[in-house]
């Protein structure tokens, strides 16, 4: 149990650091939508597709690897709460079109990139 907790803890810390890096890189970039959150969710969507395909094809790996990568790292990288707060802020400012566009971009983009990640793994396997 302690190894599982450690795997999640380490993965989440690394994922959160990468998300912070994406946010810092997007500071000063002229954009109506928060790019750091979008990049985090798109990269996370792609990587989880690869991870799902990888772990599905490698069931012999210890469960701690899946906890490290999917639950920890990708859980720390992707951010539904920040996305939700940003969209609600747009709605509160009356930016309904931007709010809808941002929500659709995150949802559709993440789903498409998850599929692309699965297909990428299958192509290189």
From Swiss-Prot:
GO terms for cellular component: plasma membrane. The chain crosses the membrane at residues 2-22, 35-55, 68-88, 98-118. InterPro entries: FluC (IPR003691). Its main location: membrane. It catalyses: fluoride(in) = fluoride(out). Pfam families: CRCB. HAMAP family: FluC. Belongs to the fluoride channel Fluc/FEX (TC 1.A.43) family. This is Fluoride-specific ion channel FluC. It comes from Polynucleobacter asymbioticus (strain DSM 18221 / CIP 109841 / QLW-P1DMWA-1) (Polynucleobacter necessarius subsp. asymbioticus). The gene is fluC.
